[in-house]
Amino acid sequence: MAESFKAKTGIGVEVIPISEKDLGTRATAAFAAGDLPDVIYHTLQYALPWAEAGILDTDAATDIVNSLGKSTFASGALSMAAVDNGVAAVPVDGWTQMVVYRKDLFDKAGLDAPTSYANVEKALKKLHNPPSMYGFVAATKVDENFMSQVLEHVFLANGVSPVDSGGFSPLDEAKTTEVLDFYKSIVKASPPGELFWQQSRELYFAGKAAMIIWSPFILDELAGLRDSAPPTINSDPTSGELASKTGIVTTFSGPSNPSGAAWGDVRYFGITTDAETDEAMK
């Protein structure tokens, strides 16, 4: 993308990759030092706090959205990043989280797809057989964004959210208890230790996990198309065997919310207040 941008505009771009969990602290430190990058690719959670802190140039972002046309963006992506008279950052992409599961094992055991708490718990009883097969690899490392993403998905599945159309909404005690009881069950069927995206992918790719929750970024890897993260279920890193045995669920339900819910992540380009604004806006 950086090379294509330079070819089109003549503007060179240095891409600085950092770990997702370090994004907040790195941006805050760079802001204090007056050394922010021109543009930051970030999640929704940073849009409004960074705008309020003076890290993001909301006028520049608003000008971009207006020049491209508000109608070319999903209204929800704009409203979630809305500030007075504009937006904090420019929506660029997003994805829907997935329950990734071994469809071959489910079919062999006569199990329904893991579209609900109940279906997952039934599958755990039949498929959890450690250490050769873990029923689930739940996120348990509390300082990883991954755990927040997985937990939010599980909460929404049961119709629990801390916000509603009026703003803050207290958590429903009974529904929240159902969420936590379910999460305990998938943690119990997971390996010991602090787990996040890395372990869940590694164990699933090794054929040692029946279910994980992951983003669509796993799909190319699952098909053996990424050298740095190949499936290890067999000796061929380019094999499509695991992909052929995998099923995907996006809408997931709890007992108090039979219609279920999906969880999505929206990403933004934020132009910083240290940027060469005209170049950054391109």
Identify the role of each PLM range.
Residues 84, 88-90, 121-168, 208-209:
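Extracytoplasmic/periplasmic solute-binding protein
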Residues 44-96, 121, 147-150, 237-250:
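Hinge/lid segment of periplasmic solute-binding proteins
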Residues 41-46, 197, 214-219, 265-267:
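Beta->alpha turn/N-cap motifs
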Residues 124-126, 165-194, 242, 246-247, ...:
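Glycine-centered hinge/linker elements that transmit conformational signals in sensory
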